[in-house]
Amino acid sequence: MKIKIFVLIAFSLSLSNLLFAQELTAKKMSEQAVLKENPEDAVKYIQSVIGNISVLAEKKAAYAFLGTLQEAMALYADAQKSYSIAAGITAGNAEGMPKKSSERLVIDAVRCALSAGDYENAKNWLNSAVRNSKSEEIQATVKLYDQWCALSSAESYEQTIEPVAMLKAYLEVPSMQIQKPAVLLTLWYITGEKTYSQMLENEYPLSPEAAIATGKAQIYPAPFWYFVPRKIE
């Protein structure tokens, strides 16, 4: 009888542990993460439990959340890896979490790769299926990031002439209007021409790009912005 009771208890504990692992969702994980004392502890917590998530949609959302947190902490290389893992998981959206398509996650990975100064990885992701996206927003972002890749690989200001010319042309392309603030900010930063900062202030006065160009905010520290060649008077 004692043996039977022991077996039943052991089975119950095993079943309880299994159910706990199955019940861990991206939403529950994120809720626990934000209760940590600091972002570093939140990241460590997520990394310690993310392997317990078995449902693909939940795992995808969990890695996307981890990438978002790492990007906010300027851990761009780590964020790029997290976004990449999420993008590679074929699944729908998790309940209670931000909805992100695989295409959007690829774009997130590209942005972080560029922020980390890893333009080779960024180019590889841009040359994936995302280039054939049916989303106008994604297509516009791909075109913008293509030029950012070119700027990242430039070793002199002269090598920025071609991507700058492309960015100037994009200002007149209707499908690129969604990225116009970013295009204007890039042109202002690279060329130093006040025309672009004035356009930002006039057309997008409340945008983060306008705040940066007018000195009300600073560009977030990232290798892309620090090492890309630019014209300095």
Q: What feature does the model see in each segment?
A:
Residues S48-K59, G88-K99, R131-Q139, L171-Q177:
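Flexible helix-coil transition and linker loops at the boundaries of alpha-helical arrays
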Residues A26-M29, Y63, V106, K143, ...:
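TPR repeat positional signature
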Residues L19-A61, E209, A213, W225-E233:
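N-terminal leader/linker segments that initiate helical-solenoid repeat arrays
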Residues T186-E233:
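Terminal, low-structured helical/coil segments at or just beyond the last alpha-helical repeat
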Residues M29-Q32, L66, A109, D146, ...:
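Structural register within alpha-helical repeat arrays
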Residues A33-K36, Q70, A113, A150, ...:
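Residue at a conserved register position within TPR or TPR-like alpha-solenoid repeats
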